[in-house]
Design a protein with these regions (language model features):
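Histidine-rich, glycine-flanked metal-binding segment
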Residues: 1-57
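Short, small-residue-enriched loops and turns at beta-alpha junctions
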Residues: 69-71, 123-126, 130, 158-161, ...
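Divalent metal-coordination and catalytic microenvironments
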Residues: 11, 31, 53, 64, ...
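Conserved beta-strand positions
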Residues: 94, 154-157, 182, 211-214, ...
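Active-site neighborhoods of metal-dependent hydrolases
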Residues: 145, 150-151, 208, 213-280
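Di-metal (Zn2+ and/or Mg2+/Mn2+) metal-binding site signature of metallo-dependent hydrolases
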Residues: 54-77
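Divalent metal-binding pocket/active-site signature
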Residues: 150-206, 220-224, 259-262
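Divalent-metal coordination cores built from histidine and acidic residues
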Residues: 65, 76-159, 171-178, 252
Length: 280
């Protein structure tokens, strides 16, 4: 009588937490790992997979994905959910999409991945245009949480708020128990090293924030690239108890290239990249 539901055989089992790194068999019962041994009899399992030459790792947690509104391409929702599952992620946080788009995508193409989302703050769409009072900011954050979001996403490189508004969004979300992710940049700074330099002032002594893709602010637009990297690392090291961050690993990355009526790009992100390639 088989003891296990599934046996994954001959894979290189890697687990950073326990320090395991060896070729082993992994036996699974009721969706949970039952045994990890150098060799397990295939006859003891209902099914088996030979994964020789491949890695067997715990599911990854990706804290910065876009699987909600980004799935609008082709009018098909949920494509990103399939992609993150194929990449080995089991838990992801969508940094900037509507809960409606998220739930529609899960219903259409859910891949079994655990998904949480942050409400994105876009003037004229999810927040009022113009300057925002403290009461309005509290209402915006509260509405995002009530809709099912884990918190909010500040897209400073695309839709910047004033430094005071940015700081107040962060502190309000902190006080309401919401998660805050921040693509750096305000009306006074850009999506560059200067925006990152502003973070300690925005947080004060108690603010907490997730700084999105920190390497995006180290492209060499203010200092040489290596100098910007060193300064960025110094900034987040000094804010170790208040800040978490991550990097985007692909060389190309998505940006919003929308222009005004005169052909000028609207997003600071795109403007920075064009200037670095000597475009005017």
């Amino acid at each position: 009588m088989p003891n296990y539901d599934l046996l994954i055989r001959n894979g290189r089992v890697i687990d950073a937490e326990s320090g395991v790194d060896r070729v082993s068999d992994v036996a699974i019962t009721n969706g949970k790992i039952d045994q990890i041994k150098p060799e397990i009899d295939p006859a003891t399992a209902n099914d088996s997979l030979n994964v020789e030459g491949q890695w067997v790792i715990p599911g990854m947690i990706d804290t910065h994905v876009h699987v909600a509104n980004a799935a609008d391409f082709g009018r098909v929702r949920g494509l990103g959910l399939q992609m993150v599952a194929a990449a080995g992620a089991t838990t992801v946080i969508d940094l900037g999409g509507s809960m409606e788009a998220m739930t529609t995508g899960i219903a259409a193409r859910g891949s079994g991945v655990n998904v949480g989302g942050l409400g994105y703050l876009k003037p004229g769409e999810t927040v009022p245009e113009g300057r925002l009072s403290p009461d309005v900011i509290t209402e915006i954050v509260g509405s995002a949480l009530e809709a099912g979001s884990l918190g909010i996403k500040l897209w400073g490189g695309y839709y910047p708020f004033t430094p005071d508004e940015t700081s107040r969004f962060i502190s309000t979300a902190n006080n309401l128990g919401g998660y805050v992710a921040y693509h750096v940049g305000t009306t006074e700074t850009g999506s560059r090293l200067d925006g990152l330099r502003e973070v300690p002032v925005l947080l004060g002594n108690t603010g907490r924030v997730h700084i999105a893709h920190i390497n995006a602010y180290c492209r060499g637009s203010i200092l040489p690239v290596e100098d910007e990297i060193q300064e960025a690392l110094q900034i987040i090291s000094e804010l170790r108890d208040q800040v978490v961050s991550e990097v985007h690993l692909a060389r190309p990355n998505f940006t919003l290239g929308k222009c005004d009526e005169e052909g000028n790009v609207l997003a600071d992100v795109v403007s920075n990249c064009l200037k670095l390639r000597d475009y005017e």
